[in-house]
Amino acid sequence: MPNIKSAIKRVRTTENAEARNISQKNAMRTAVKNAKTAINNNADNKAELVNFAIKSVDKASQSNLIHSNKADRIKSQLMSSSK
């Protein structure tokens, strides 16, 4: 446990950022999973879910939660399987 006031504040800030990042990453994973399920089941709203998943992947990539190449790979897989 840090003793210096600024270090204590930094720990608190880091915990908040970590919680926010984990939440956003989990939301992205859920969106991708829902899109893949819709594609496999040939659901009516699969295009809508794929667009939402791509949007969430792009946001995660911009926030440096995932590497840009991984984001491109996920988007490519979604687009190719949705056709």
From Swiss-Prot:
Pfam families: Ribosomal_S20p. One of its GO terms (molecular function) is small ribosomal subunit rRNA binding. The keyword rRNA-binding applies. InterPro entries: Ribosomal_bS20 (IPR002583), Ribosomal_bS20_sf (IPR036510). Keywords: Ribonucleoprotein, Ribosomal protein, RNA-binding, rRNA-binding. One of its GO terms (biological process) is translation. One of its GO terms (cellular component) is small ribosomal subunit. Belongs to the bacterial ribosomal protein bS20 family. NCBIfam families: S20 (TIGR00029). Binds directly to 16S ribosomal RNA. This is Small ribosomal subunit protein bS20. The lineage of its organism: Bacteria, Bacillati, Bacillota, Bacilli, Bacillales. The gene is rpsT.
